[in-house]
């Protein structure tokens, strides 16, 4: 609940800055909707990120339980509805020895993971993202898109994460989804998403403003993981 409140605060700041443009001098259109400041530009997400589709692991290589030398396989279940990282969502693991040529799929802090498919009858997860806050623990699976911010105009992982979970952005992204048995997003759908580019100094100021919120979220997550691991260890000892 605390993390939900922190994320809501961060999203409110993002909306104020990059959707409503409240801190900046701007105009409105004939319907009263805010227009971006004159020195902002319109572009696409592709300029801000390096995109990679998740790896298609062979089912025979996956483990049902973790070992001392394995990666958690990051699947869509690791992304929360509404956005966020679900540490309890891991259902598969893979030995590190099987991943020696897959370094680019190993996740690092600041990576953003997007759900690329969903159920046609109940689209709830499609397009939502998680922001990775731990290094060398997860490796990304197929049906999850890996978005790595590249530093363009000082646009931070926080900004991309909040953008991709913003209701306005999601509505437009999902409009381009492909509908079959399931609803799917392609790489092109994602990287060609429209966005506004603020000047670099504004993006840097935004990152500085929201970083304390995300630091608190990461700290809370780390404590939750530690408590969970301790509880499991105690449970294992008691069951002997």
Predicted regions, residues:
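Short, ligand-facing micro-motifs at secondary-structure edges
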Residues: 80-92, 112-140, 158-162, 171-176
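Sequence-specific dsDNA recognition surfaces
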Residues: 46-65, 77-114, 118-120
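Short, small-residue-rich loop/turn micro-motifs
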Residues: 17, 77-80, 133, 189
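Short, well-ordered beta-strand micro-motif
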Residues: 75, 146-148
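Non-cytosolic juxtamembrane linkers/loops
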Residues: 150-155
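Non-catalytic DNA-recognition/assembly elements of restriction-modification systems
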Residues: 1-59, 192, 196, 200-240
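A short glycine-rich beta-alpha junction/loop motif
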Residues: 137-145, 174-204
């Amino acid at each position: 609940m605390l993390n939900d409140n922190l994320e809501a605060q961060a999203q409110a700041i993002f909306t104020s800055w990059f959707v409503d443009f409240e801190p900046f001098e701007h105009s409105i259109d004939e319907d009263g909707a805010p227009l971006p400041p004159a020195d902002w530009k319109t572009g696409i997400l592709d300029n801000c990120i390096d995109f990679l589709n998740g790896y298609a692991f062979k089912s025979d290589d996956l483990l049902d339980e973790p070992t001392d030398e394995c990666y958690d396989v990051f699947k869509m279940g690791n992304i929360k509805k509404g956005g966020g990282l679900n540490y309890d969502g891991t259902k598969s693991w893979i030995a590190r020895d099987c991943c020696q040529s897959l370094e680019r799929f190993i996740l690092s802090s600041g990576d953003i993971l997007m759900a690329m498919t969903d159920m046609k009858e109940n689209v709830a997860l499609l397009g939502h993202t998680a922001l990775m806050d731990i290094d060398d623990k997860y490796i990304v699976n197929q049906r999850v898109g890996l978005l790595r911010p590249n530093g363009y105009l000082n646009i931070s992982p926080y900004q991309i994460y909040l953008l991709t979970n913003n209701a306005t952005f999601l509505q437009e992204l999902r409009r381009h989804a492909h509908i079959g048995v399931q609803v799917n997003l392609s790489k092109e759908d994602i990287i060609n998403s429209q966005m506004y580019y603020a000047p670099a100094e504004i993006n840097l100021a935004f990152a500085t403003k929201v970083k304390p919120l995300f630091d608190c979220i990461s700290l809370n997550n780390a404590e939750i993981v530690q408590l969970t691991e301790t509880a499991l260890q105690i449970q294992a000892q008691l069951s002997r």
